[in-house]
Amino acid sequence: MDMLNENASLLTLTYHGSRQVIEGYNVMGVAKAALEASVRYLAENLGKDDMRVNAISAGPIKTLSAKGIKDFGSILTVVEEKAPLHQNVTTTQVGDVASFLLSNMSSCVTGQTIYADNGFSIMGI
């Protein structure tokens, strides 16, 4: 990959709907699951060139695309109630995780999906 610098770090965003059914998320869940698989395969393929590939699975955040998800406000409420830290994640928090993954501090991390969701993803029903 000639257009990437040596020691490059590639990063993408995904969502919990890739692993569990989220009502109304539908085909996006399938797309995000494929994206996460691509992260793992790219990490293996690019590792020989000392390039890292990771994903951040952020909790629900109020974005333009979130407006297309039916009852998005109720999803935010459920996360706030059930997540161990009892709050929704902010764009700043996700940015902080991204900064870590793009920095040399994470030089041994590749092929991973890092959950930045205040612990919501560890909770059962």
Feature map (PLM): residue ranges:
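Catalytic loop of short-chain dehydrogenase/reductase
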Residues: 6-34, 39-48, 60-61
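Short, small/polar-rich loop/turn modules that mediate ligand/substrate recognition or access, typified
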Residues: 47, 52, 109-111
